[in-house]
């Protein structure tokens, strides 16, 4: 598979392991239009890639991903918003079509869609300085692009609602304690830890490994089918609210937003 058309994503092959890195380090890998579009294509390509047996997903620089780029949101036209949500659905659906094991190496902050990408991975390692959360509500929108699916799946409804409704971030240690991620490792050992496990998977009985992943993910796929369209529709509605506009303006003006519930 040729990944040379990707620029906001960096793809590096180590034998049968494909390392995919979000590649906007100057913006903490915040997801803008170009990166969002590439994310909506990459997983379908990986699913068809016969040279790749395992994927490691990480971020360039000091962040995994700071989530959606607020500067992108402030200028969205209605047609662009429609395209965004079409892509958002495709990202999650295509992620679940990837039969190869995917390991997230969370090397720094992972928030919003950034956190969702990590949490939909099969094994999640986080650096000891990483923080993880889904602060959609803090910009006045529903956690619609996968957060409402994956957080309850990993930590149960009660804990998921606490963190999704507040938008609070967790330390890597706290995320490990509640079962949101697999393991915290020292930052300098993160990639080595992820690649070592990836190589073990790649050298294993790949058909059995893939089949086991597909089987476990049947319940997750059913949850996506139940929740995702509703959560995305509710998130899209929020883009037209006064609260969302206030959150964007407050971000631009570097102040706390004053929400009115409208």
Protein language model regions, located:
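Structural motif
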Residues: 17-21, 56-58, 77, 103-105, ...
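Crotonase-fold acyl-CoA enzyme core
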Residues: 94-209, 232, 240-241, 246-249, ...
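Short, charged, surface-exposed hinge/linker loops at domain edges
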Residues: 213-222
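Conserved CoA-thioester-binding segment of acyl-CoA-metabolizing enzymes
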Residues: 1-60, 93
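Terminal peptide-recognition signature
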Residues: 20, 24, 39, 57, ...
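Glycine- (often His-adjacent) and acidic-residue-rich active-site loop
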Residues: 3, 48-51, 59-94, 110, ...
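Short loop-to-helix capping motifs
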Residues: 24, 49, 204-205, 254
